[in-house]
Regions:
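A short amphipathic helical element positioned immediately N-terminal to and/or at the very start
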Residues: 1-10
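Mechanotransmission and gating elements of multispan inner-membrane complexes involved in transport
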Residues: 174-181, 185-286
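Hydrophobic secondary-structure segments that place a key small or acidic residue at a functional site
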Residues: 104-115, 124-216
Length: 309
């Protein structure tokens, strides 16, 4: 019987090899999809840790999570500096990290923030950001690069970079008159930090100080950089901010305060709850893909395995 099967397979070796190849591909796809799924979940889950709330302009929780943490999409609106200060000084708040987004550099997002970002931001298992070269920004036109930005653009310390207005990968509007200088490069994190250009909030304000119309100023209206540095560069608005509480038991009550804030419409989300919402959204697609690949795997032997004779 075994000899008969062996002869049959030999006589149909082309079909048998094709069947084995198809099965191998099906199994590889199944394993690959599962590995990608786990990798995506791990990457998303490790992007921010130790943050109790994320606050931004009123909108969907997923939208707020995606643009503030993952640099995906855009904010529906900004929130005022005064509102940020109100919650920064709240008795239940231990720390905050402000974010200002809206510009880019060769497709990489530019993030305006302050020194607390380098001191307090955590990712993964509450890991701190580390520098592979240089130091945090101190001047208005200093920039700190994520590891991928530095590697792919081949930047070194003291190199100049030009920021583009807006978030398009090929923006035609550039802040060419206000270049930044690379003063630091962060160590790899495996998070969106690696794909981010970090500048100070004052740097964001300085870039746009004569762009009131959203376009470059006419030559006669241009403000030179020496004059810019003499101005008050406190931002009028930011995009979002991270919140660390003195006690996690206050998370829901402060979230409610933010969501019912009378000065302007704001939203506060719990990062873990927003991530769970994202997993629920993706679960249907994941399940459908696994079913399709499983059916392919099951059907291949039935459809192509040669019958002994």
């Amino acid at each position: 019987m075994i000899n008969l099967i062996a002869k049959s397979l030999w006589n149909r070796k082309g079909t048998a090899l094709l069947t084995l190849f198809s099965i191998a591909i099906s199994v590889a796809l199944l394993i690959g999809v599962e590995q990608i799924r786990k990798g995506v979940r791990t990457s998303f889950s490790s992007a921010v840790s130790g943050t109790d709330l994320i606050v931004g302009a009123r909108g969907g929780s997923l939208q707020l999570l995606l643009y503030s943490v993952f640099r995906m999409g855009n904010a529906p609106n900004n929130l005022t500096w005064e509102s940020y200060q109100d919650f920064k000084k709240h008795s239940r708040v231990r720390w905050t990290i402000p974010f200002s987004l809206g510009d880019s550099h060769h497709g990489y997002r530019v993030l305006g923030t302050n020194h607390d970002y380098f001191k307090l931001f955590r990712y993964g298992n509450r890991q701190r950001l580390k520098f592979s070269e240089g130091k945090p920004f101190s001047g208005v036109f200093d920039a700190v690069l994520g590891s991928e930005v530095a590697r792919k653009r081949k930047y070194r310390l003291n190199d100049p970079i030009i920021v583009s207005h807006g978030t398009g990968s090929s923006s035609f509007l550039k802040h060419e008159d206000r270049p930044f200088t690379v003063v630091g490069i962060l160590a790899p994190t495996g998070t969106p930090v690696d794909q981010t250009v970090h500048v100070s909030l004052e740097g964001i304000t300085a870039m746009h100080i004569d762009w009131e119309s959203g376009a470059p100023p006419m030559e006669e209206d241009r403000i030179d950089n020496e004059e810019v540095l003499k101005r008050d560069l406190t931002p009028e608005a930011i995009t979002a901010f991270l919140v660390g509480l003195r006690s996690k038991i206050h998370a829901f009550s402060l979230q409610r305060e933010v969501n019912t804030y009378r000065e302007e419409p704001l939203s506060a989300i719990l990062p873990g709850a927003a991530l769970q919402e994202l997993w629920e959204l993706l679960r249907t697609a994941e399940t459908g893909l696994r079913v399709i690949l499983s059916l392919i795997h099951i059907s291949e032997p039935t459809r192509r395995t040669p019958t002994p004779y």
